[in-house]
Amino acid sequence: HFPGNSIFPGVLQIEALAQVGGVFVLSKVEDPENWGTLLLKIDNTKFKYKVSPGDQLILKMELLSAVRRGICLMYGTAYVGSKLVSESELTAQIVRNQPPNE
C-alpha cells in the first residue's frame, strides 16, 4: 500500500468481513441458493492495528438482529492471531435471485 511500509488496506479488511457476512446471513435461510446479499451500511468501523501482507486474518461474524423483512445487522471482527485488528457493524439485505432470461 505504501512503498517501504506495506499494509493490507482497511477497505479490503471490510470487504472480507462483508463477504463473510453475506455467506453467514444466507446460512440462516432455507434455500440459500435462491438468494443473494446486498451490503446496505457499514458503521462503527475501527482499525486497531496494522495488518501486513502475509498476515492471516481470522474473520468472525455475529448476528445482532434477526433477519426481518430481509434486513439484518451483523457485527464482524478480524483478528491476526489473538489480536483484534479491525471491527465493524454491517447492515445487509437478502434479495431473491432473478431467474436467468432464456
Residue ranges and their predicted role:
Residues V51-E102:
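HotDog/MaoC-like acyl-thioester-processing domains
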Residues H1-T37, P100-E102:
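Hot-dog-fold acyl-thioester-processing enzymes
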Residues F2, S6, V11-L12, A16, ...:
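Solvent-exposed, flexible loop/coil residues
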